[in-house]
Amino acid sequence: MKKLLIGCLILLTSACQSTTPTPTPSLFPTSTPPPTPIPATASPEPSSTPEPSPTPFPRLFTEEFDGSLAGWVILQAGNDGVPNIKTEGSRLILQMDFPYIWLYALYGPEDYANIRIDAQFENRALTPSSAGLLCRYSEESGWFEYNVSADGTYNVLYGRWLSVGVAEYLPITDGTSRKIQPSGATQKIGLTCSDSTLWLYVNETLIRQVDVSSYELTEGKVGLAASSFENTPIVIGFDSITISEP
């Protein structure tokens, strides 16, 4: 209907034009100008909830092996037989079913110069075997290793890798101590690496100080050690390890 009225109005206006044309009123009321269109923008996608940052690994701590071994690295020398490594009953269990295996559990996130390491463990083997501690471990330069055996002996070694899975051990010192308990007993060992001296502890008693000034190891990682000899199986359970200032 609106189209028809507009057509009639145009015809009448053309036929009756005067010299000064009268402005034609608008057929539609004056409307408010349409708003300036806003450029289309992509709808924002829903943002995902940020995941919490992982807890940084501590530098000084006590590990009681209640959970995973995150931050720890397992290395093996000697026999390439696969060991059984697990956490069970708040213990790190290192089981070696093959002879002449040296196992290491290294704490990877940190390097230390002067540091003290203490561990509590149980040697369940009825045959010769050892448990120990490491300090100043470097894949390129080597490490210091302190071991105690169920027969009452101990030693300190300088170890270094010759190739993958093949290590060389140079004896620094050895001895015996009545403080070392037989197999089946829970006991503690401690090692302080301070400048050019190693301090050896058994059941919280200092048994020896060792001069290592001739070895150019200034800092590195720390860790635990376990080894089997000619008879197997060997099972060593670490209850805890404490890393502290010397």
PLM regions with names:
Residues 16-62:
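Ser/Thr-rich, Proline-interspersed low-complexity disordered segments
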Residues 61-81:
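Short, tryptophan-glycine- and acidic/Ser/Thr-enriched carbohydrate-recognition patches
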Residues 65, 239-243:
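Extracellular beta-strand elements of beta-rich domains used
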Residues 82-101, 225:
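Short carbohydrate-recognition loop motifs
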Residues 96-163:
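Secretory/extracellular carbohydrate-interaction modules
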Residues 164-188:
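Short, aromatic/His-centered strand-loop micro-motif at the edge of beta-sheets
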Residues 185-199:
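Localized edge beta-strand/strand-to-loop motifs within extracellular or lumenal beta-rich domains
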Residues 210-237:
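Flexible glycan-contacting loops in extracellular carbohydrate-active proteins
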